């Protein structure tokens, strides 16, 4: 069910979004060769608690940790483990939090240390730019298929691919709400966005095939050909004349 948020609800989501943005900035500053993934998870959980929020990932459908850390060919939903980041790793972090039961969700990808392959940098840049291009067009009346087509066309112009099985989504009192927003589509098709909706746009991009597979842990999603991946996401309010990003972080 699609929900329209009132001003009180929007304010709570803005608080969650700002705490999340600051928590992700903390993680960006920590990502260096030699850092343990468990330390990143612990630092984020402590940060959001200190700032009046709760985790919305931990125990969600049985997920055991507070953030998702996906490395290199891992696209999404990587479980933080006793693993040390290496120089040149492509690291994606997807995280969320709740303030008084209202959710926010965001993700970023960066290279740990120095990129070993220039194409990895291009992949990351293209994925973030695809998100920015989609956000620039958000306003009441735009249709979900148009959003997906913007992302797909930009990504595929660089000969990268967008997986078909994982999408953006609405968000509010639940982490995942209607509408679901694929990273591909046909312009002028699908549900129209309305003022007061809050959605998550999240381009997930693979350097090779669009196909994916799930690891034995039943959570971690890989590119089927083990090509490098990237993922960016923001929680976004649809306003009267456009949109407002609730999880914007400083570069």
UniProtKB/Swiss-Prot annotation:
Binding residues for a divalent metal cation 1: 94, 105, 233
Q: Which UniProt keywords apply?
A: Aminopeptidase, Hydrolase, Metal-binding, Protease
Any one GO biological process = proteolysis
Q: Which PROSITE patterns match?
A: MAP_1
Concerning Pfam families, the annotation shows: Peptidase_M24 (PF00557)
- Give the required cofactors: Co(2+); Zn(2+); Mn(2+); Fe(2+)
The keyword NAD appears for this protein: no
The UniProt record gives the binding positions of a divalent metal cation 2 as 105, 169, 202, 233
Chain sites annotated for binding substrate: 77, 176
Give me the comment on cofactor binding: Binds 2 divalent metal cations per subunit. Has a high-affinity and a low affinity metal-binding site. The true nature of the physiological cofactor is under debate. The enzyme is active with cobalt, zinc, manganese or divalent iron ions. Most likely, methionine aminopeptidases function as mononuclear Fe(2+)-metalloproteases under physiological conditions, and the catalytically relevant metal-binding site has been assigned to the histidine-containing high-affinity site.
Q: Which reaction does it catalyse?
A: Release of N-terminal amino acids, preferentially methionine, from peptides and arylamides
InterPro entries cross-referenced by the UniProt entry: Creatinase/aminopeptidase-like (IPR036005), Pept_M24 (IPR000994), Pept_M24_MAP (IPR001714), Pept_M24A_MAP1 (IPR002467)
Q: Per the record, GO CC terms?
A: cytosol
Which GO MF terms are attached to this record?
initiator methionyl aminopeptidase activity; metal ion binding; metalloaminopeptidase activity
| Documented EC number(s) | 3.4.11.18
HAMAP family tied to this protein: MetAP_1
Q: How does it assemble?
A: Monomer.
This chain's function reads: Removes the N-terminal methionine from nascent proteins. The N-terminal methionine is often cleaved when the second residue in the primary sequence is small and uncharged (Met-Ala-, Cys, Gly, Pro, Ser, Thr, or Val). Requires deformylation of the N(alpha)-formylated initiator methionine before it can be hydrolyzed.
Question: Which family does this protein fall into?
Answer: Belongs to the peptidase M24A family. Methionine aminopeptidase type 1 subfamily.
User: Which protein are we looking at?
Assistant: Methionine aminopeptidase
Query: Which species is this record about?
Result: Mycoplasma capricolum subsp. capricolum (strain California kid / ATCC 27343 / NCTC 10154)
Q: Give the organism's phylogenetic lineage.
A: Bacteria, Bacillati, Mycoplasmatota, Mollicutes, Mycoplasmataceae
